[in-house]
């Protein structure tokens, strides 16, 4: 599943080919995604793109008339291709612009979404989202206050988009390992010092992943077709039974909140 660094990488990759150009038309071959493609998007024509941004794992294409909201789902990807490019299997949507290029959305599992809104402030999927992890709003004091009275596993807590957006499974695992905190530790038992360490580590891990183009595991490719390279630096994620890079012990795994979790029982004591 593309996480925040992958979406940020996609955003940076597609922006130069879309910003300040005009959408000539939108071609929708398969409207049945996680939610039906918005009718306003299907009929969109001759509208200028003025900006592209990201909120959580949503791509936002700002136009003169409103906003296109894209989510890559479990296996979706976007790429910039010439308008005469051959259509591949699972190429569901093309946003055609007036520079000879188009933005093509491919999604084998069809868990993504492409929606339209005229007002971002009232967009229903954004109303309960927490702060961006790389923003100043996400800080140690915020995390400490948010974690009080939360009797949930820390890893589950960090992956809650109402707490902070975009800290997905891969990056939660990596951050907890670096901080030496067990993923099953109750959120309410976090100390202020641990919150400080976690916030700084999450920001650092995400920044490094963005610089390296995101994590390539199964489905993610950058818009130009190159893979992300952060997977080469993963310390614990996907490394069950391999030696811990800190102590040499064996990395273990367990299921937390229906997601695979990886940790070193020696370096990450439960408490």
UniProtKB/Swiss-Prot annotation:
Its cofactor is Zn(2+). The keyword Translocase does not apply. Binds 1 zinc ion per subunit. Its EC number is 3.2.2.23, 4.2.99.18. It catalyses: Hydrolysis of DNA containing ring-opened 7-methylguanine residues, releasing 2,6-diamino-4-hydroxy-5-(N-methyl)formamidopyrimidine; 2'-deoxyribonucleotide-(2'-deoxyribose 5'-phosphate)-2'-deoxyribonucleotide-DNA = a 3'-end 2'-deoxyribonucleotide-(2,3-dehydro-2,3-deoxyribose 5'-phosphate)-DNA + a 5'-end 5'-phospho-2'-deoxyribonucleoside-DNA + H(+). SMART domains: Fapy_DNA_glyco, H2TH. It comes from the Bacteria. GO terms for molecular function: 8-oxo-7,8-dihydroguanine DNA N-glycosylase activity; class I DNA-(apurinic or apyrimidinic site) endonuclease activity; damaged DNA binding; zinc ion binding. The active site is at residues 2-3, 57, 259. A zinc finger (FPG-type) spans 235-269. InterPro entries: DNA_glyclase/AP_lyase_DNA-bd, DNA_glyclase_Znf_dom_DNA_BS, Formamido-pyr_DNA_Glyclase, FPG_cat, MutM-like_N-ter, Ribosomal_uS13-like_H2TH, Znf_DNA_glyclase/AP_lyase, Znf_FPG/IleRS. Keywords: DNA damage, DNA repair, DNA-binding, Glycosidase, Hydrolase, Lyase, Metal-binding, Multifunctional enzyme, Zinc, Zinc-finger. SUPFAM superfamilies: Glucocorticoid receptor-like (DNA-binding domain), N-terminal domain of MutM-like DNA repair proteins, S13-like H2TH domain. PANTHER family: FORMAMIDOPYRIMIDINE-DNA GLYCOSYLASE. Monomer. HAMAP family: Fapy_DNA_glycosyl. Involved in base excision repair of DNA damaged by oxidation or by mutagenic agents. Acts as a DNA glycosylase that recognizes and removes damaged bases. Has a preference for oxidized purines, such as 7,8-dihydro-8-oxoguanine (8-oxoG). Has AP (apurinic/apyrimidinic) lyase activity and introduces nicks in the DNA strand. Cleaves the DNA backbone by beta-delta elimination to generate a single-strand break at the site of the removed base with both 3'- and 5'-phosphates. Belongs to the FPG family. This is Formamidopyrimidine-DNA glycosylase. It comes from Haemophilus influenzae (strain PittGG). The gene is mutM.
């Amino acid at each position: 599943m593309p996480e925040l660094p992958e979406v940020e990488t996609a955003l940076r990759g597609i922006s130069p080919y879309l910003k300040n150009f005009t959408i000539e038309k939108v071609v929708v071959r398969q409207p049945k995604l996680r939610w039906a493609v918005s009718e306003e998007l299907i009929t969109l024509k001759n509208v200028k793109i003025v900006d592209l941004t990201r909120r959580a794992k949503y791509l936002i294409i700002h136009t003169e008339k409103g906003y296109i909201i894209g989510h890559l789902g479990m296996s979706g990807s976007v790429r910039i291709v010439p308008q005469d490019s051959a259509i591949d299997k699972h190429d569901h949507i093309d946003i055609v612009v007036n520079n000879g290029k188009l933005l093509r959305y491919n999604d084998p599992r069809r868990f993504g979404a492409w929606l339209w809104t005229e007002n971002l402030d009232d967009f229903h999927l954004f109303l309960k989202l927490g702060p961006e992890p790389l923003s100043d709003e996400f800080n140690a004091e915020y995390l400490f206050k948010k974690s009080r009275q939360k009797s949930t596993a820390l890893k589950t807590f960090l992956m809650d988009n109402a707490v902070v957006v975009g800290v997905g499974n891969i990056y939660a695992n990596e951050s907890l390992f670096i901080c030496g905190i067990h993923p099953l530790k109750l959120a309410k038992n976090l100390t202020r010092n641990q919150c400080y360490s976690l916030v700084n580590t999450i920001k650092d891990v995400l920044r490094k992943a963005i610089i390296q183009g995101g994590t390539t595991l199964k489905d993610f490719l950058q818009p130009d077709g190159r893979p992300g390279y952060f997977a080469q630096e993963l310390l614990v994620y996907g490394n069950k039974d391999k030696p811990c890079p800190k102590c040499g012990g064996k990395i273990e795994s367990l299921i937390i909140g229906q997601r695979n979790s990886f940790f070193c029982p020696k370096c990450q004591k439960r408490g």
